Amino acid sequence: MTECTVHQAAEAFIGHLRESGKKERTLYTYRKDLDVVEAFFGADRQLAEIRLPQVGKFYKSDLLLKLPDGKERAERTVTKTVRVFRMMMVWARESGRIEELPLPKSTPMGHSRVKESSDEQPNG
């Protein structure tokens, strides 16, 4: 496992997406989403130290749910930030930066379901 901070992981994840051909506008909006993640968890915190209860607190936090002026963020914006956070964490696990994925099963995945969906048992 490669040790890294939340900030280092966010930067490396954005770099990975850039190399994968994501558009600069997408990278810009994802970086803004990850700024919210860094503000909550702390940029210098070790990514591997993040646990499920802390993620739950993040999902309920004013940093995620409200704008700086106190107004509520649009549900679509909150969902996207959560999705980008999950994408980064899944990438971090797949790239050896963390061993366990500290995310609830109900976290939205967005358009690209990652390998986890193949790990689930089919019903029936």
Where are these regions (language model features)?
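N-terminal helical hairpins
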Residues: 1-3, 19
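N-terminal core-binding DNA-recognition domain of tyrosine recombinases/integrases
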Residues: 11-25, 31-118
